UniProtKB/Swiss-Prot annotation:
E.C. numbers: 2.5.1.47
Quaternary structure, from the entry: Homodimer. Interacts with SAT3. Component of the cysteine synthase complex (CSC) composed of two OAS-TL dimers and one SAT hexamer.
Residues with the N6-(pyridoxal phosphate)lysine modification: K154
Functional description taken from the UniProt entry: Acts as a cysteine synthase. Plays a role in the sulfide detoxification in mitochondria.
Native species: Arabidopsis thaliana (Mouse-ear cress)
Any one Gene Ontology BP term: cysteine biosynthetic process from serine
MF (Gene Ontology): cysteine synthase activity; identical protein binding
The protein, known as: Cysteine synthase, mitochondrial
List of residues binding pyridoxal 5'-phosphate: N185, G289, T290, G291, G292, T293, S377
Residue intervals passing through the bilayer: none
Pfam families hit by this protein: PALP
Transit peptide start and end: 1-87
Required co-factors: pyridoxal 5'-phosphate
Membrane in keyword set: no
Length: 430
């Protein structure tokens, strides 16, 4: 998206710039000192090339890099005027916690262009939840993994597991066949990496996963084998092991057991959350699927501050970590029905069970009230975070919660069933 505002008078420019930044950044602005440039426009352009001007600073307001230029220093000062946000306890915070200036490395040609798609993974933004968090005494900030290249947190482990196996000499492009059981998002994360590096990929997935996921996987060239939905991820794992035995040069990445899974979150996701909150995160909330996100992030944050609470989320219908039994549920991506080896249970202070219905309803409300189109597991994580944020003992605290995937790949699921039925019945107006 490119937005350019031209005006004849710089006061009007500054006012418009402030309004646009306010809207785009949720009434929180990026700011820094900047020398005036020769441009008479405000330019917001993701992934623009580096400017030749030494006075131009680069900003991070989203996963992309944006360029900001103003006709005068006073324009910039006015448009970038600091805004403060009140915590639930009445204190105020510096808005730089939300938007951080960064300097991106450039190639030998000086252009700010990634060499390949894997370089776009990570450094996702965080955003406060507002309307949906009414009645909460703590603040909730969502880590938007929906803004990864393929719109899910699993992009990170797709990259890390393939890269790790390559570095150890286990696989090589054009020869090895990658095999993996998946609920969908890990498969997509693997599929775009496999496509970019030249691997054949075979995925096994419960038939209960969304149609959008199937289409996406096939679009990337992956081979897809559906398994009995009643057997959950256990059935997908068993089928993958069978394929592994019968396929020459096959290699299973084993997301549930692979240390490269939590490692990438320890090395990237955790530090990103810590840096974006300036170490002020009090509670971390994440769904439990493979265990990689909560284990990796939890370890990093606990090392930085042992007092930080780490809270996991699982489906009520399959609450094995809470002492229940595995069972079918509608929260795709969490609640595998078994305890993954990658899950460090000692890192968690609490596990909250959220029903499929509550997860779906919360995901709907995130779209309607926050403008965030997220998947069902994001709804589950948000529902748990809201419960925690309403506890009196958490007044004034900052809760970070991971939103794992984008909602568009759930259009065929119960999440949007009523809307889908409504639009299918729509007729053109005469």
């Amino acid at each position: 998206m490119v937005a350019m505002i031209m005006a004849s008078r710089f006061n009007r420019e500054a006012k418009l710039a402030s309004q646009i930044l306010s809207t785009l950044l949720g009434n929180r602005s990026c700011y820094t000192s900047m020398a005036a440039t020769s441009s008479s426009a405000l330019l917001l352009n993701p992934l623009t090339s580096s400017s030749s001007s030494s006075t131009l600073r680069r900003f991070r307001c989203s996963p992309e890099i944006s360029s900001l230029s103003f006709s005068s220093a006073s324009d910039f000062s006015l448009a970038m005027k600091r805004q403060s946000r009140s915590f639930a306890d009445g204190s105020e915070r510096d808005p730089s916690v939300v938007c951080e200036a960064v300097k991106r490395e450039t190639g030998p040609d000086g252009l700010n262009i990634a060499d390949n798609v894997s370089q776009l993974i990570g450094k996702t933004p965080m955003v406060y939840l507002n309307s949906i968090a009414k009645g909460c005494v703590a603040n909730i900030a969502a880590k938007l993994e929906i803004m990864e290249p393929c719109c899910s947190v699993k992009d990170r482990i797709g990259y890390s597991m393939v890269t790790d196996a390559e570095q150890k000499g286990f696989i090589s492009p054009g020869k090895s066949v990658l095999v993996e059981p998946t609920s969908g998002n890990t498969g997509i994360g693997l599929a775009f990496i496999a496509a970019s590096r030249g691997y054949r990929l075979i995925l096994t997935m419960p038939a209960s996963m969304s149609m959008e996921r199937r289409v996406l996987l096939k679009a990337f060239g992956a081979e897809l084998v559906l398994t009995d939905p009643a057997k959950g991820m256990t059935g997908a794992v068993q089928k993958a092991e069978e394929i592994l035995k019968n396929t020459p040069d096959a290699y299973m990445l084993q997301q549930f057991d692979n240390p490269a899974n939590p490692k990438i979150h320890y090395e990237t996701t955790g530090p990103e959350i810590w840096d974006d909150t300036k170490g002020k995160v009090d509670i971390f909330v994440a769904g439990i699927g493979t265990g990689g996100t909560i284990t990796g992030v939890g370890r990093f944050i606990k090392e930085k501050n042992p007092k930080t609470q780490v809270i996991g989320v699982e489906p009520t219908e399959s609450d094995i970590l809470s002492g229940g039994k595995p069972g079918p549920h509608k929260i795709q991506g969490i609640g595998a029905g078994f305890i993954p080896k990658n899950l460090d249970q000692k890192i968690m202070d609490e596990v909250i069970a959220i029903s499929s219905e509550e997860a779906i309803e919360t995901a709907k409300q995130l779209a309607l009230k926050e403008g965030l189109m997220v998947g069902i597991s994001s709804g589950a994580a948000a529902a748990a975070a809201i419960k925690v944020a309403k506890r009196p003992e958490n007044a004034g605290k900052l809760i970070a919660v991971v939103f794992p995937s984008f909602g568009e790949r759930y259009l065929s699921t119960p999440l949007f069933q009523s809307i889908r039925e409504e639009v299918e019945k729509m007729q053109p107006e005469v």
